[in-house]
Amino acid sequence: DLYKIAEICRDKGVKSYLTVNTVIYDEDMTLMRSVIDAAQKAQISAIIASDVAAMTYANEIGVEVHLSTQLNISNAEALRFIALAMWSYWQRAEYGSGTYNPRDHRQGHICGPKGHPVRIEMFAHGALCMAVSGKCYLSLHEHNTSANRGACAQICRRGYTVKDSGLELDIENQYIMSPKDLKTIHFINKMMDAGVRVFKIEGRARGPEYVYTVCRCYKEAIEAYCNGTYDEESIGRWDEQLATVFNRGFWDGYYLGQRLGEWTHRYGSGRTRQKTYVGKGIKYFSRLGVAEFEIESGELHIGDEIVITGPTTGVIIQKVEEIRYELQTVEKATKGQRISIPVKEKVRPSDKLYRFDKREE
């Protein structure tokens, strides 16, 4: 899939990144190099790495490296050290050893391999690790699957009973190790003013409507700040939209000086709506702007909000304005029927059709 994904990204003018940020042991070196070689061949924009071995090899073969939060850099001097090391590796690969003098660095700047100031990337939205992306061993201890090797079993997301010396403690919330999700859209202006140039969104294992909604909201927020239209009304609208997709509740993280974390009060998502599978795409009539679907589960009504997803189609979100069954306009469609509805974009065979429903607490 790597080559196909990279090709799609290039065709759409989107950068692609590959995470190679697990703990790497000696026996992993061959695999690590083959993965980075594949990233280079596929023309992936950059890898995200935390192990020095991965960063060194990527620099040697000319693959751009972004430092992962797993590297646990917490001060400017640590960042300067990594930046100088990567510059040295790059210079050695380009011009041979002994050509770089650290004193040539401009004072006050932390520069990357090609001499440009290092860009600061920060997470802006999404799930948070209770270990702050550190070396967590809960999953390894309980299930022998290492969170540091890409196999976290999400042990921290469960509810727990707290005991001390045999006494059970009365606590307000049983999810004592499951943080709420990060949300910064209401102070994205402060992050931009601070010099952040790349915003990262945690979206692993999330549905396409999550990626679509969250990326769109933050893109609108950044553009609004740049053109002077960033205001409370817009923030309220984005907040409502972000609440409709997967979340465990939201908080500001530690960005604004908060010293204690905020923990979720539920297992799973707190989104305000959920998607229900309805059917699959059959055909699209481009001249009419109409798509044919086969209803495979439940019902579809006029006025329902739907999402259509597919590997090529991406995400289409809209309301059902009309339903036609056997050339007749109907109020609803039921399982087994082949129906047509107006759709603003092309739908492809086997695209999945979902209905958005208000989530029951």
Curated annotation (Swiss-Prot):
Domain of life according to the entry: Bacteria
Keywords: Hydrolase, Protease, Virulence
Name of the protein this chain belongs to: Collagenase
SUPFAM superfamilies according to UniProt: Translation proteins
Activity regulation, per record: Activity somewhat enhanced by calcium ions, inhibited by zinc and Fe(3+) ions and by p-chloromercuribenzoic acid and EDTA. Activity is enhanced by salivary peptide cystatin and reduced by salivary peptide histatin.
Listed EC numbers: 3.4.-.-
Xref: InterPro entries: Peptidase_U32 (IPR001539), RNA/ubiquinone_mod_enzymes (IPR051454), Transl_B-barrel_sf (IPR009000)
Entry annotated with the keyword Protease: yes
GO molecular function, one term: peptidase activity
Protein's job: Has collagenase activity. Active on soluble collagen, reconstituted type I collagen, heat denatured type I collagen and azocoll, but not gelatin or the synthetic bacterial collagenase substrate PZ-PLGPA. May play a role in virulence.
Family listed: Belongs to the peptidase U32 family.
PROSITE patterns for this protein: PEPTIDASE_U32
Cofactors required: a metal cation
GO BP field: biosynthetic process; proteolysis
The protein's assembly and partners: Homodimer.
